[in-house]
């Protein structure tokens, strides 16, 4: 999440379309261990694996990815009834995947989180990250 917010800077002067997502699906093992949702956790659902918590969301995320592969647009062939995945842009919104497939939708970045990420982008070189 942090890297996605910080990496917005290369697109400020480019014409690239930027789209963001947040896979916020906590599986039982990670919840018990305290890991939370790990980086690239959605990959298993995209490629046909995943946990019981992820299975209801798999057709939705697969629809976006296969649509992008087919048409270079995640919305063209997305799963019927799923929300439009909008461009990041000035609204700073991203497609959010919570544990409930009926609540998948666009959400804005929390201003506090953006402030923390901006701070980290300033000190990142100092702390070696």
Where are the regions a protein language model picked out?
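C-terminal helix-and-tail extensions that cap enzymatic domains
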Residues: 1-129
